[in-house]
Structures are given as C-alpha cells and as structure tokens.
Amino acid sequence: MDQPSGRSFMQVLCEKYSPENFPYRRGPGVGVHVPATPQGSPMKDRLNLPSVLVLNSCGITCAGDEREIAAFCAHVSELDLSDNKLQDWHEVSKIVSNVPQLEFLNLSSNPLSLSVLERTCAGSFSGVRKLVLNNSKASWETVHTILQELPELEELFLCLNDYETVSCPSVCCHSLKLLHITDNNLQDWTEIRKLGVMFPSLDTLVLANNHLNAIEEPADSLARLFPNLRSISLHKSGLQSWEDIDKLNSFPKLEEVRLLGIPLLQPYTTEERRKLVVARLPSVSKLNGSVVTDGEREDSERFFIRYYVDVPQEEVPFRYHELITKYGKLEPLAEVDLRPQSSAKVEVHFNDQVEEMSIRLDQTVAELKKQLKTLVQLPTSSMLLYYFDHEAPFGPEEMKYSSRALHSFGIRDGDKIFVESKTK
C-alpha cells in the first residue's frame, strides 16, 4: 500500500504516538501534555513519546508547526526519518532545531540531493553526534557543510551514495571516529587516502563493497594518514596482492580487520585464507569478526613457515624470514593416515598351538569363530574367545558378544586371540 503524500512530521507523530496506537508507558515513558488547540487540529490532548522516535517510511515531506514540535520533542535524543519524502533541508532544519537533545539522526533514503544545505540550516544540527545519510545522494559540498557545523559529530554513514571520488574540505574534522562509506564505487587509493586527511582521528573505517583495487601508498605515509585507525573493513574489495595485506601493518593502532570476499583469497581453502592472513598481520587481534587467540596465532605462524618452505627464495615473503627467526626452520608435518585399519595380523593360541593369521576387522565375533572353526577343530557354539592387546597393561578380554565388530576392540598387528573350549 502506498504511503500518503504531503504529510507533516507533526501529523505523523500525532498519529503514530496517540494513546490508541502507543499506550501510556510507566517508568521511562514520557507523557507530554499539550495545551488546548484549535478545533480540527490532529493533535491529541496527551501523547506518550519515548526518547527514541522511529518515523521511517511515513511519507513525510515537511515539518509542520514548529511550536508543536518543540512542545513534544524537548526530551527526544534519537530520531529516525529514513525513507520519507523530505527534499528540502529547510524542512529538516525546522524539525531538528526544535529537538534540543537530539544526538542521533537518520535521514537515509530521502531525496535531499535536490536542495542545497546552507550553513544556517546545518547549524541547527550542531548537537548531533551520529548522522546517517545512506542513499541520500548527498553531495560532498553538503557533507563539508555538515562537518563545519557539527563540532561534536562522531559517527557518519555515507553508504549507497554513488561516490566515485572524494572531495576534501578546507578544514579537517577532528571529532569523527567512525565512517561507514560502503557500497559506493571508490576504486582508487588516491580517493581513499583523502579520508585520512579529512578525518585524522578516525578509529573505524568501513569500506565494504567498494572496488578498491590496491593500497598504493608507502608504509611511512600510511602511518601518517591514519594514525588512530583501529578497525578497517575491506570486505568485498578488489584487492589482489599480498603486498596490500602486508601494508595494513603500517597502521600503527590497527587491531581489527575484515577481508572476506576479496579476489586475492579466492584460490585458497578456508583454512589457508585465515591462517595465511593471521600470520601476516601480527598486531591484529580480531579477523573477520573472530578473536585471534594466542594459540591460533602460533598455529597460523607455524603453518605459514611450512606453507612457504619449498617456495623459491626470490618468491618467499618477508614475513617468512621474520617467523624463521622466531621459530626456526620447521620440518613438514608427517602425513598420518587416520583411516581405520581394515585387517590385522594376529597370533591365534589354542592348546599348545600358535598360528599367525590375518583377520578382517570389519567382521563380527561370530564371523571370526567361523573363520577359526577349521583351525581349532571346534564347533562355533563351543568356542570361547579372548582378545589380548600386547601393549595394554590389562589381561585378556573375553569376546562374549557375537554381534560385536572386531574393529571395536582396537585390534592391531601383533595382538593375540586365545581360543578355549567350553567343555574344557
């Protein structure tokens, strides 16, 4: 069903949070009393508003009465206006300027690229710490204006905005700690490096689903560009070289990396991918969302040495030599056949006779008795069988259950089977 068009923020607010749709809550619920209004006003005498308002996909195009917004929203700290029809920044400003406690604002999927954001409008956002502009097609000029007027902005979401380039403002933003800029088309490192210039305090950079093809930057320059970067996501980027992975070591504070779905790792098995990456990134404590334990790191580094042990010296990565210094040269792991043994050579003892024979371990005790019938000259019903493990400290074990498979005894070459007669 299509959303009605031309609706105001206040109209939707009153409808959604009326007592009929949003019953009064005790405790943290906030009851807002509104003075009597002219006849025909959609406002109720009393609304119950939480501090987090979710008004997404409501067809909102404008603010409505600003006095009413101020009366209702003085306590509101989070506001989700995503997927509405707001296309004028002035209308957004009318809403936000009357929500003095606002810290989180989501304007995703509103057609705001159709208007210019003036600094006077952006100034009404000054207290916002987290701003979401996904799929808003916000221009870099708009982003620059926001950065100038939001001195406390810590988290910015610019996903799905069709960016192919990055434009730097005249002044950098020191407050921003987290930037989500996924699902754009930022292929060249020359564009990504601008983000380091713009946001020198950046802690988390999420670049997933861009097509970045290489990290073309000297190691010392990387450290200066992103001195505080702790976490980076390169999920589904276009990286194709191990040199690009090695360059991540140049970020002095990097602890967390996401690298799933990149062309470089496609030829490797799941085990090889993780171990080879862990071994190359000694400072990373979390890879693809999973903690790297000390035990996993040592296993990965030893695996790395063995993986490259037979590679020509000119092709061996530098990290290999570092790990050789740490662990020394390691011999290849012995290949152990873990398949169950199918037969065993055992000694069969009966009276004073000893006969060496090969027995199938997939047969049952009853079938073994049939095999021994000719040798010991006893009917199967008169046989008592005992199994003796030549390496075990215990005595013989009676093989009393006819349907039990021989492999369940753990029979190996050199073990003994004793046969006695029940009539003995």
UniProtKB/Swiss-Prot annotation:
It holds the Pfam family Ubiquitin_2. CDD domains: Ubl_TBCEL. The keyword Phosphoprotein applies. Its main location: cytoplasm. InterPro entries: LRR_dom_sf, TBCEL_Ubl, Ubiquitin-like_dom, Ubiquitin-like_domsf. LRR repeats lie at residues 73-98, 99-123, 124-147, 152-173, 175-196, 201-222, 228-249. Keywords: Coiled coil, Cytoplasm, Cytoskeleton, Leucine-rich repeat, Phosphoprotein, Repeat. Residues 349-375 form a coiled coil. It is found in: Cytoplasm, Cytoskeleton. GO terms for cellular component: cytoplasm; cytoskeleton. Residues 334-424 form the Ubiquitin-like domain. Acts as a regulator of tubulin stability. SUPFAM superfamilies: L domain-like, Ubiquitin-like. The modification Phosphoserine is found at residues 18, 41. This is Tubulin-specific chaperone cofactor E-like protein. Residues 262-303 form the LRRCT domain.
